[in-house]
Amino acid sequence: MPAAISRNWPAPAKLNLFLHINGRRADGYHALQTLFQFIDCCDMLDFKVTETPELILHSNMSGVVADSDNLILRAAKSLQQTTGFNGGAEIWLDKRLPMGGGLGGGSSDAATTLVALNKLWHTQLSTEELAKIGLKLGADIPVFIHGFAAFAEGVGERLQAVNPSEPWYLVIAPDAHVSTADVFQDPLLPRETPKLAIDTLMSQPWANDCQKLVVSKYPQVAKALGWLLEYAPSRMTGTGACVFGEFTQQQQALAALAKLPSEMQGFVAQGMNLSPLITRLSHP
């Protein structure tokens, strides 16, 4: 009897509510302090367990499947190798999040793959063990595996659960691809923001140390942020290109979205301190 498809595994986007760069480490990575919060806008994945070890990926987004270095496939392969599981999976990705915009979609897809297949393959790794696999694939992946809003330090892997307010956001995705590597290699990037205690950081105005540099180099980001600042406190997430404005009411965010210039793409989403992936785990 063929295996059933396990459907509707969410891979939520994240926002960096602040992002501070505290210096460059000896290994070349940057020391960061950042605050992650999920939003209720997600990619969706379906999985079918197979008896043979092949890993097959389908997607509604052209170009995703052709990439053999795809994080979804690398995550599944890493779980196979770590556990010795000799079966495989067929995976369907419904890509809804903008790619390469600082929303963490690729990392979230990989995290959902690890969490879902760990359950469906009955490999029984702990959350910490899954996070260790994820960290080898990308610094953002552990926060999606743990599934709670978090203050992060190091390269982003040391996590402390936090409970910020859950406002509504208007997220704009400018028509620009910002290379994270280029941003972190740029000599003009500020790298000397002092490390502060979490209580201090949570109580002061929030900022993104990458924003000034990216805005200066990408006019599309500058234009989107300038427009959004007329309606709400706004800043960039990650290394961009996406920017977000914060609203207390959904209706306020929707009213601003209705005025969005036709050349810009945007959506309204609510902040979530608990990932919908954790909720999905409790279902068959």
Curated annotation (Swiss-Prot):
Keywords: ATP-binding, Isoprene biosynthesis, Kinase, Nucleotide-binding, Transferase
Source species, domain of life: Bacteria
Active site: 14, 140
EC numbers, comma separated: 2.7.1.148
Binding-site residues, ATP: 98-108
Pathway connected to this protein: Isoprenoid biosynthesis; isopentenyl diphosphate biosynthesis via DXP pathway; isopentenyl diphosphate from 1-deoxy-D-xylulose 5-phosphate: step 3/6
BP GO terms, sorted: isopentenyl diphosphate biosynthetic process, methylerythritol 4-phosphate pathway; terpenoid biosynthetic process
InterPro entries with a match to the protein in the record: GHMP_kinase_C_dom, GHMP_kinase_C_sf, GHMP_kinase_N_dom, IspE, Ribosomal_Su5_D2-typ_SF, Ribsml_uS5_D2-typ_fold_subgr
Pfam families: GHMP_kinases_C, GHMP_kinases_N
Catalytic class of the enzyme: transferase
GO molecular function: 4-(cytidine 5'-diphospho)-2-C-methyl-D-erythritol kinase activity; ATP binding
Catalytic activity: 4-CDP-2-C-methyl-D-erythritol + ATP = 4-CDP-2-C-methyl-D-erythritol 2-phosphate + ADP + H(+)
UniProt record similarity statement: Belongs to the GHMP kinase family. IspE subfamily.
Reported function: Catalyzes the phosphorylation of the position 2 hydroxy group of 4-diphosphocytidyl-2C-methyl-D-erythritol.
PANTHER family, sorted: 4-DIPHOSPHOCYTIDYL-2-C-METHYL-D-ERYTHRITOL KINASE, CHLOROPLASTIC
Protein name, as recorded: 4-diphosphocytidyl-2-C-methyl-D-erythritol kinase
Gene designation: ispE
